[in-house]
Amino acid sequence: MDIQFLGTGAGQPSKARNVSSLALKLLDEINEVWLFDCGEGTQNRILETTIRPRKVSKIFITHLHGDHIFGLPGFLSSRAFQANEEQTDLEIYGPQGIKSFVLTSLRVSGSRLPYRIHFHEFDQDSLGKILETDKFTVYAEELDHTIFCVGYRVMQKDLEGTLDAEKLKAAGVPFGPLFGKIKNGQDLVLEDGTEIKAADYISAPRPGKIITILGDTRKTDASVRLAVNADVLVHESTYGKGDEKIARNHGHSTNMQAAQVAVEAGAKRLLLNHISARFLSKDISKLKKDAATIFENVHVVKDLEEVEI
C-alpha cells in the first residue's frame, strides 16, 4: 500500500508543483488505484509514474474548486484510450455538482467514453460511511473551507493472522496441503493421533491501516475525528508559522495547525501538502522544522513522491 503524490501545490500549478491530486495504490491488496482529487494536469503527472489509468477504479473529490477537479475531463477521456486493455467502469465520489460538471464537460466537448461512470454524490446531510467493500471502509466528513469540502478516512479491515509454520513443523505437521487447511481454520488429527487445533497455530488478526486524506480546510475538530489513530494523515499546509489569521480568512491551515491536528488525533505520521508557490526550497525546510516542534514525524511531500504505508 502506497500513496503517490501527483500534485502537491496550492491553487495554481508552478514549475515544481502541480495542483491537487494523489493516488492511493492498493495493488497488492485489491489490484486497484484510488485517486483523490484530480486537478488540471493530473493525467500528465500519471504519465511520469507506473500507474495504469485502467487501474484507477475510484475517484474521490474533496470539493469543487477548480484546482481539485479541472483535470477530470482530460483524465477520463485519456482513460478510454488504453490500447489492448479491457475497459472497466469507474466510480466517482464527491459533493453534489460533480456529476453535472463531468457530464457537461464530456457533452460540450463531444467526448464519448467506452466505459460507465457511476456517480456517488453527497451533501452535508448524507455523509458518514460512503463506501464499504470486503477489505475497506471509507468515511467522509465535512471540513471548514470556503465552500462545501470533505475529508476522507480510509480504513482497511483487519488482516488475517499469519500461520506459524515453524510451530507446525515442530508439532509434526508435514509441509503441504495440511498447512492450507489449518490456515483456513480447519482442525486436524494426524496419523499418529495428534490433534492440531488451528487456532493454536494462527496469530491474532492484524489491525488494518488507516489513511486520512483531507481537502482544503481551516483547523477544525472534524479533521481530528477523521484522523484518530491514523497511520498516515495527509493535511494541507497552504500557510506557514505566524500566518494563522490569513489562513483562516482564506479557508486554509498552517503547518503548525496541521501538526496540532496530528497530535490531537494520535496520528502516526503527518504528510504536508497543498504547498503555496511562494514557498521556496529553504522555506520548505522551515515548514517541516517548525511543524516538527509540535509533531515530530512530519514530512513535506513533493510531486511524484511515493510514500509506503
UniProtKB/Swiss-Prot annotation:
Short name of any one Pfam family annotated for the protein: Lactamase_B
Catalytic reaction annotation: Endonucleolytic cleavage of RNA, removing extra 3' nucleotides from tRNA precursor, generating 3' termini of tRNAs. A 3'-hydroxy group is left at the tRNA terminus and a 5'-phosphoryl group is left at the trailer molecule
Documented EC number(s): 3.1.26.11
UniProt-recorded Gene Ontology molecular function terms: 3'-tRNA processing endoribonuclease activity; zinc ion binding
Cofactor(s), by name: Zn(2+)
Keywords: Endonuclease, Hydrolase, Metal-binding, Nuclease, tRNA processing, Zinc
Binding of Zn(2+) 1, residues: 63, 65, 145, 216
Record has ATP-binding as a keyword: no
Binding-site list for Zn(2+) 2: 67-68, 216, 274
Co-factor binding comment: Binds 2 Zn(2+) ions.
Active site (catalytic residues): 67 (proton acceptor)
Class of this enzyme: hydrolase
InterPro entries attached to this UniProt entry: Metallo-B-lactamas (IPR001279), RibonucZ/Hydroxyglut_hydro (IPR036866), RNase_Z/BN (IPR013471)
Keyword Phosphoprotein: no
Database matches in CDD domains: RNaseZ_ZiPD-like_MBL-fold
Similarity field: Belongs to the RNase Z family.
Assembly description: Homodimer.
NCBIfam families: PRK00055.1-3 (NF000801), RNase_Z (TIGR02651)
Role: Zinc phosphodiesterase, which displays some tRNA 3'-processing endonuclease activity. Probably involved in tRNA maturation, by removing a 3'-trailer from precursor tRNA.
Protein name, per record: Ribonuclease Z
Organism: Streptococcus pneumoniae (strain Hungary19A-6)
Gene for this chain: rnz
